[in-house]
Regions:
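Membrane-interface helix termini and inter-helical loops of multi-pass transporters
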Residues: 55-64, 157-168, 193
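Small-residue-enriched transmembrane helix starts and helix-helix packing motifs
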Residues: 73, 93-109
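Interfacial segments of multi-pass membrane proteins
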Residues: 104, 121-143
Length: 220
């Protein structure tokens, strides 16, 4: 019986080793790539938050002047045009540096200016660091979540909750759900646009609208 038990124990040990080896790539992804991805987003969020808070009054003032959105729309047009012409990169979360993430966060903070496309600005920044097009779109989308939540917290402190009615709360909930669905559709659409390099179409549109805005400012 001892040889049988010894053989059985040996088989179990071998199977455990096989399972551990097969499971290793998954464990590496969970403990390394995902963790690095989260850290990159956190690093990107820091400069975005600082710029967003520091430039809040400046952005509010810029929204009142038609010239500023016009200029920013033209800048967006240039960025989108560049994005289509950046060579495909191969960087995954592991290859992206924290310096890259910080600079991308700065670009998102600057994109709070009216007329600057947040997605266009951050995706162009991501592509310029060498990210794959798929990763650039996903990273741009994910990093927007803490930025949007942060902006919501800043704005919500001025809301008088005592004055809110149940209907208002329901509207906020419905609005949040709709925004989530629209966001999901947008990221799917953006993946197709970026992969097929169709940003030039939006670039032309932004250029035209920017020129119209600037013309309207001087005409008025």
């Amino acid at each position: 019986s001892t040889p049988i038990k010894s053989s059985a124990a040996s088989d179990v040990y071998k199977r455990q080793r096989v399972i551990t080896k097969e499971d290793l790539p998954y464990r590496k992804i969970v403990h390394n790539s995902y963790r690095k991805f989260v850290m990159l987003v956190i690093v990107s969020t820091i400069p975005t938050g600082i710029i967003g808070i520091a430039a809040k009054d400046l952005v509010s003032a810029a929204e009142q002047i038609l010239l500023v959105p016009g200029i920013c729309l033209i800048i967006t047009a240039v960025l989108l045009f560049i994005a289509d012409r950046i060579p495909d990169g191969g960087k995954t979360p592991k290859q992206v540096t924290y310096t890259n993430a910080f600079l991308i966060g700065i670009s998102q903070g600057i994109a709070t200016m009216p007329g600057l496309s947040r997605s266009g600005t951050t995706i162009t920044a991501c592509l310029s660091t060498g990210m794959t097009r798929k990763f650039a779109v996903k990273y741009s989308f994910i990093m927007s979540i803490p930025a949007i939540l942060g902006a919501l917290v800043v704005e919500i402190k001025d809301v008088e909750f005592a004055a809110l009615q149940s209907a208002d709360i329901l509207n906020y909930i419905v609005g949040t759900l709709v925004a989530a669905v629209v966001g999901y559709i947008c990221i799917k659409t953006m993946l197709v646009v970026v992969r097929k390099k169709k940003f030039t179409i939006f670039s032309i549109y932004c250029l035209i609208m920017g020129l119209v805005s600037i013309g309207g400012y001087f005409y008025m």
